[in-house]
Structures are given as structure tokens and as C-alpha cells.
């Protein structure tokens, strides 16, 4: 039968702005950079919260697409006894495709640096990295969350910022030292 099982009741719920891309955009803008955000949000309160936060931080949101009948990507983090667990719902992030990038290309090609991370589809990340490389636009790849990426196009990124766990996922047959020396 249907029973609610729990070890303990929760105490608090906090809702905060976020997403790796949005956090990086806000941080760069607060440091004085001129920032344009490219991506997708859902047709919901979370999407509106993200859009409002970006605008409040003077980020150009002209290339953020609101996807009808779709939820905004979210991450739900539970913390119990010092241990966290994260449930990620891709939502509209899964809709960031080549057409979204192409629509924003006039802004992208003018950028001093394009920042991308693994919370959008891998084929889209590959497209961005390859096109930026071809057109001499610097690209920084934050390979989080950790996943296996094709080293053929991965090496085309100008900068890669993995943590130790992500580094071992990208280069599973090499030690950290071997990878850094390569």
C-alpha cells in the first residue's frame, strides 16, 4: 500500500536563484562584466524568478527563450545530518539546442568569453565549443555535473574548469598529475 516513509521531518524550505549558468552570469555581472545570458526557461514561477534576478543584475536576457508547456530546470537539494542529496529536473534546459545558439550568435561572436556547463544537452555544448573554436571565440567549459565527454571536441575549449571528480570522469584512465601535464 501507499505509505509515506521518512526518517525525519524537514525543518525548513529555502528557494534560491541558481543554476550554474545563471550563477556564473550574475557573478560576472557583479564584477562589472557586460553579460548576455542564452538559454531556456519554462512557463512557470521559477522561470520568472530567474528572469527577474538576471534583469535585476543588469544581464541582457534578450536570448532567453520561454518554452511553452515546459517547466524551468530546477535542482532540489535535501540536507540531512550533514549529508546532501540533489535531484535535478532538466525541464527547459533540455530544450537548449542549436537553434537557440544560432539565434543568439550575433551576441556570442562579440563576446570576450563564452561560458558553458553541462546542464544543457551535450550535443549543444559540443556545437558551442566547436563553433566558438572555429570562429575564434574563447570558450570556458565548466564540466559539471560530471559526465563523459568526447575528448576530440573537449580539447577545443579554450579553458576547462573541472574539480577533481569531474577531471577523473573526463580522463578516467589518467591520474590527476598525468592529466594536468598532458
Feature names for model-found ranges:
Residues 1-40, 45-59:
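Glycine-rich phosphate/adenosyl-contacting loop at the front of the ribokinase-like
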Residues 11-14, 38-43, 61-72, 142-144, ...:
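Beta-strand->loop->alpha-helix junctions that form or flank phosphate-binding loops
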Residues 58, 94-99, 139-145:
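Short gly/ser/thr-rich secondary-structure transition/capping motifs
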Residues 129-182:
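Conserved phosphate/ATP/ADP-binding segment of small-molecule kinases
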Amino acid at each position: 500500500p501507499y505509505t509515506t516513509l521518512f526518517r525525519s521531518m524537514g525543518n525548513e524550505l529555502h528557494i534560491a536563484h541558481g543554476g550554474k549558468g545563471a550563477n556564473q552570469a550574475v557573478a560576472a555581472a557583479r564584477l562589472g562584466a557586460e553579460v548576455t545570458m542564452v538559454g531556456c526557461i519554462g512557463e512557470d514561477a521559477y522561470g520568472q524568478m530567474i528572469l527577474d534576478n538576471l534583469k535585476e543584475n543588469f544581464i541582457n536576457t534578450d536570448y532567453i527563450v520561454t518554452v511553452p508547456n515546459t517547466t524551468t530546470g530546477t535542482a532540489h537539494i535535501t540536507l540531512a545530518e550533514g549529508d546532501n542529496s540533489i535531484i535535478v529536473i532538466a525541464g527547459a534546459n533540455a530544450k537548449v539546442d542549436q537553434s537557440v545558439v544560432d539565434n543568439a550568435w550575433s551576441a556570442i561572436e562579440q563576446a570576450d568569453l563564452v561560458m558553458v556547463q553541462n546542464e544543457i544537452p551535450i550535443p549543444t555544448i559540443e556545437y558551442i565549443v566547436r563553433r566558438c573554436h572555429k570562429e575564434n571565440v574563447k570558450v570556458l567549459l565548466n564540466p559539471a555535473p560530471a559526465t563523459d565527454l568526447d575528448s576530440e571536441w573537449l580539447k577545443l575549449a579554450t579553458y576547462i574548469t573541472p574539480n577533481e571528480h569531474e577531471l577523473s570522469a573526463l580522463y578516467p584512465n589518467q591520474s590527476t598529475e598525468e592529466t594536468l601535464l598532458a
